[in-house]
Amino acid sequence: MNKILFHAFCVMGCLSLLTACEKGDITNDIDTHSVKVLEANTSFDALGGTDSIYVEGNVTHAYANASWAKTQTKGNLVTVTTEPNRDLQSRHTTVVIKTSDVDSTVIAIDQLGPYTQLDMPGTIVLDDEAGSVSYKVVSTFGIKVSSSDSWITPKYEHGALTITTAKNDEGHLRRGEFTIESEAGKQKVKVVQVNFDKDLKGKYYLQIDETDKNNKQVTTLYNASLEKKGDAYVLKVGNSGVEVPVIYDADNVGLSIASGQAAGKFKQYYIGTVVGASESKLSLSPSNLISGEFNYSEEVTKKVADLDGTVLTFGKPAMLILGAFDSPQFSNDSYKAFYLMGTNVYLYRLKPTTASAKSFDQPTFKLK
């Protein structure tokens, strides 16, 4: 859970907006010139309001040096009233108080900017069934919420933001968004409806750009299958028993592949993963990852009828190698060849009724 903290939209975590001053910026220094101040309450929140200053002696005249602050006097009392502050920053001015033509004092007046705080993730993930989730909102002036996606209904009332989603009967994951609006502007929040077993698990084409024996780049399709094994996830590649461990990111609905992971055996070789954000960043370190998020593309279904439209890409420069090692301890010395190697890796989910193509066949189409 990431805290989204706005000071007129001051944000920490997934969302990124503008910053206003903290309460620590407030000062109330009093510059006295012969008039003794008995009591002064001169710090205001963004809503504004009225507070009091008491001095020794009757006040003959008092005024504020900013249009957003007004003064009234009665005896030794000066009341200061501030208007609501809808600016991004806190603001400061002074009030001058006189008890005679020569006796006066100057008092600092400070007012905070708007404040809104939400504790919520940057991406909200809900199941395919109809449901809702609520988050507490602390806000000076409140927020406005809206969504152009018919299946997402955001609502703000009584200090809470509630997001309600309709049942997902589309047969695939779906992504949408809603907008939060406050004094600082607008911020979009992602919403995903997905069920791993229904929408992501199953058969895929793994598409990858490889270099053939003639040193020409070719786009190849491999049969693949995304499955859950206990608490772990694997991507089976081909029909030779190779199972690539993958990390399922439930918070963003994506996959990562780490380097140095054992993926089974092929003939006498141990298969291990080597990945990098680009060829120059390849490493056997398990901290080296390539990652991508699942999306739905209707264009893909129009292009290839066998596909259900669910797509994930690890990025065009990202490189995936399933290396063949002569030892289960993966190293440069034990690396002998590769089972698979290329860039621009995609996963395309097949419809459940689609029969698998022969493993390692050259594709008759290109999807990218």
Language-model features: locations:
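Bacterial N-terminal signal peptides that target proteins for export
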Residues: M1-F9
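Bacterial Sec-dependent N-terminal signal peptides
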Residues: C10-S43, S100-V102, A108, A357-K368
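Predominantly extracytoplasmic/ectodomain segments of secreted and cell-surface proteins
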Residues: G24-E56, T105, L112-V138
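Surface-exposed binding patches on compact interaction domains or structured appendages
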Residues: V35-N41, L47-T81, S132-I163
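Short, surface-exposed loop/turn segments at beta-strand-coil junctions that are enriched for proline
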Residues: E83-L88, A166-H172
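A short beta-strand micro-motif common to beta-rich folds, especially ectodomain repeats
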Residues: Q89-D101, G171-A184
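Extracellular interdomain linker/stem segments of modular secreted and single-pass surface proteins
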Residues: Q111-D119, Q193-L200
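Ser/Thr/Gly/Pro-rich, low-complexity flexible regions
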Residues: Q193-K368
